[in-house]
């Protein structure tokens, strides 16, 4: 009693005398309404400190909050909580709201900590609106961990968060790499809860869950592309199909980026035929889609397909008419995720003409292979260089000649011939000349002279004689002896198309460097099909082909295999995959990613391999990768809530049990489970 009295007196001293007199008068005047607070006898009145101090502190807190005096409110709140615990729900809601409106990170941090503590003691103390305001304020301040923590609390309690507000919170979160990691994991959690509540129809669900919308997925998928979380992006695409969210035009382009990063050409090819006869204003929007598809054709070293795609784009044949596709252009179209031969596979709905007006999304990178001007798609010099290099490497120059003429006529052929001469590919340049002449489209004299000049410079006199005869036969010249070796005209033309020449040199040098072979992309595609079909035997045979061919696996190879084992609950097999990953890391053949390691952690938690869990968490810390401890904690509580909770080290029978017990306790301590 004496201690509480001193605290109240100290609180009085923080206010001026006028305020104190006012408060005392207010308390004394309340005798009529609250007679129990004071003695009604004729003896001198004695203040009941136990009751009156609580009333006074409560009034002071309300006044400070009303006047937005955050410092005073915090001091009074601390005194109140020390004496009486948390104030009533109305005051707490007001207090957290006032703190949420602060632009100071310190007050926002206190609001977040206070909220978690209050909800731990009384789960219903704070309203959903207050938690929503707090999460938005935290996200704006880039306190993404705290913001995500509040979002997860609301999800667990069944508070419905409107789509507009959730978009705002997530939009601020995904501005950073850690925020993207948290937002993607939260979106996975929302989708899982939505499927559980709406498909499982469980009565124990805490409340309804709003279905994530297209814009929310686009925000998170776009940030996955921006920060390189392509594997997490792939998981979200499959979740998009699982919860039946329609992919709009933005979604398709963002998904194309993820498929390109993961080397999934077959998945991206499915979209091409469904884009349909889009309006001219949308053609530019799909520039990155075709850029990514063309990139994959080059990665697979499928030069023929790359050439046909380039020709289709330039001739606008890629945009198949809607009538030929046999469906209404306004209705969402259905695509299989994985092979269409898998009957039980997921299917995603797409609407290529739909653009969300409130979506400030898109791909913020420049297209490499496709340009867009005058309402038309075209290819860049980078694409042209890759096509020329690819066709020559595959010894298929006649097809190259046909493609060049179809793309740009004689002018483009002349540019390519000039570039070939500049880098010393004289015979290739001569072959293109012959092909064009055979097709009935002979080149101009200046182009012939360019090749002839190259022959003379390289001392290839026999080839020069052959070319002179051809020029004479074609009627381009009458006297071969009058042809000078190098004329000012040819010297000037040598420097005209330097960009194409330089890009060809880059392609030649890049071809000499060690890269992921095209065969690896083919094997990964087969592996993806077998894993989605749950064909373990064929999947393992395909996976084992990779090291046998002396090709180092990619993170996509491991992700695909882990995803299959995870869907089958075969966690022991995932430990074997982790061993393969470590061997490839040690041999410097593999650079792991945060999303791959995080997937391993979650699966080892599900399987109860806590030694592997701690090993991975330590490895991620050493390599400056973010660990979503709250997600780990939630995963643990779903499956192992009471595991070894009361056991001691002395209770272990074997050394293995003792070690397992120690790993579990270490994990519980790390994620904050007491």
UniProtKB/Swiss-Prot annotation:
Stored Gene3D superfamilies: Tetratricopeptide repeat domain (1.25.40.10)
UniProt-listed PROSITE patterns: PPR
Domain of life: Eukaryota
PPR repeats by residue range: 409-443, 444-478, 519-553, 554-584, 593-627
Pfam family, one: PPR
Key words of the record: Repeat
Database matches in InterPro entries: Pentatricopeptide_rpt (IPR002885), TPR-like_helical_dom_sf (IPR011990)
Family: Belongs to the PPR family. P subfamily.
UniProt protein name: Pentatricopeptide repeat-containing protein At4g17616
Native source species: Arabidopsis thaliana (Mouse-ear cress)
Taxonomic lineage from the root: Eukaryota, Viridiplantae, Streptophyta, Embryophyta, Tracheophyta
């Amino acid at each position: 009693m004496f201690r509480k009295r001193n605290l109240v007196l100290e609180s009085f001293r923080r206010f001026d005398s006028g305020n104190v007199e006012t408060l005392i008068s207010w308390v004394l005047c309340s005798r009529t309404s609250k007679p129990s607070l004071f003695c009604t006898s004729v003896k001198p009145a004695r203040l009941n400190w136990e009751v009156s101090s609580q009333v006074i502190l409560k009034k002071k807190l309300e006044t400070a909050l009303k006047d937005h005096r955050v410092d005073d409110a915090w001091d009074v709140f601390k005194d109140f909580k020390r004496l009486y615990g948390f104030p009533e729900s109305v005051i707490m809601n007001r207090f957290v709201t006032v703190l949420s409106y602060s632009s100071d990170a310190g007050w926002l941090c206190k609001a977040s900590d206070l909220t978690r503590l209050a909800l731990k003691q009384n789960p219903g103390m704070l309203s959903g609106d207050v938690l929503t305001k707090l999460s938005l304020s935290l996200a704006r301040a880039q306190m993404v961990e705290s913001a995500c923590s509040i979002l997860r609390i609301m999800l667990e309690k069944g508070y419905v968060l409107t789509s507009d507000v959730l978009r705002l919170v997530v939009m601020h979160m995904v501005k950073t790499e850690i925020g993207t990691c948290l937002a993607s994991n939260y979106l996975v959690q929302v989708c899982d809860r939505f499927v559980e509540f709406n498909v499982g129809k469980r009565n124990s669900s805490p409340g309804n869950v709003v279905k994530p919308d297209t814009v929310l997925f686009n925000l998170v998928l776009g940030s996955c592309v921006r920060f390189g979380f392509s594997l997490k992006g792939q998981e979200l695409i499959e979740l998009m199909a699982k919860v039946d969210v329609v992919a709009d035009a933005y979604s398709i382009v963002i998904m194309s980026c993820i498929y390109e990063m993961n080397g999934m050409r077959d998945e991206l090819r499915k979209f091409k035929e469904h884009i349909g006869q889009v309006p001219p204003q949308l053609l530019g929007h799909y520039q990155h889609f075709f850029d990514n598809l063309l990139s994959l054709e080059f990665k697979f070293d499928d030069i023929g397909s790359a050439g046909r795609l380039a020709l289709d784009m330039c001739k606008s044949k890629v945009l198949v008419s809607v009538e030929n596709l046999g469906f209404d252009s306004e209705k969402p179209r259905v695509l299989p995720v994985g092979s269409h031969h898998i009957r039980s596979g997921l299917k995603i709905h797409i609407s290529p003409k739909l653009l969300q007006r409130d979506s400030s999304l898109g791909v913020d990178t420049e297209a490499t292979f496709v340009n867009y001007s005058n309402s038309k798609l075209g290819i860049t010099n980078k694409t042209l260089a890759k096509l020329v290099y690819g066709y020559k490497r595959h010894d298929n120059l006649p097809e190259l000649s046909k493609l060049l003429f179809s793309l740009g006529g004689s002018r483009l052929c002349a540019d390519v011939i000039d570039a070939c001469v500049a880098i010393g590919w004289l015979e290739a340049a001569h072959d293109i000349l012959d092909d064009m002449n055979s097709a009935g489209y002979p080149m101009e004299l200046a182009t012939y002279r360019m090749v002839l000049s190259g022959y003379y410079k390289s001392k290839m006199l026999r080839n020069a004689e052959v070319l002179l005869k051809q020029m004479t036969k074609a009627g381009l010249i009458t006297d071969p002896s009058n042809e000078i070796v190098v004329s000012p005209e040819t010297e000037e033309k040598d420097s005209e198309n330097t960009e194409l020449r330089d890009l060809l040199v880059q392609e030649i040098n890049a071809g000499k460097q060690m890269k992921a072979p095209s065969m690896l992309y083919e094997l990964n595609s087969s592996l993806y099909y077998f894993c989605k079909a749950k064909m373990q035997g064929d999947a393992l045979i395909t996976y084992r082909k990779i090291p046998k061919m002396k090709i180092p696996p990619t993170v996509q190879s491991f992700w695909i295999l882990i995803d299959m084992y995870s869907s089958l609950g075969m966690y022991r097999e995932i430990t074997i995959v982790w061993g393969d990953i470590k061997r490839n890391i040690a041999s410097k053949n593999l650079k792991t990613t945060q999303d791959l390691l995080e997937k391993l952690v979650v699966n080892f938690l599900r399987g109860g391999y806590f030694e592997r869990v701690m090993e991975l968490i330590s490895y991620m810390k050493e390599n400056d990768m973010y660990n979503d401890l709250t997600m780990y904690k939630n995963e643990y509580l779903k499956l192992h809530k009471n595991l070894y909770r009361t056991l001691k080290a002395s209770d272990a029978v074997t050394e293995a049990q003792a070690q397992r017990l120690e790993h579990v306790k270490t994990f519980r301590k790390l994620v904050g489970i007491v």
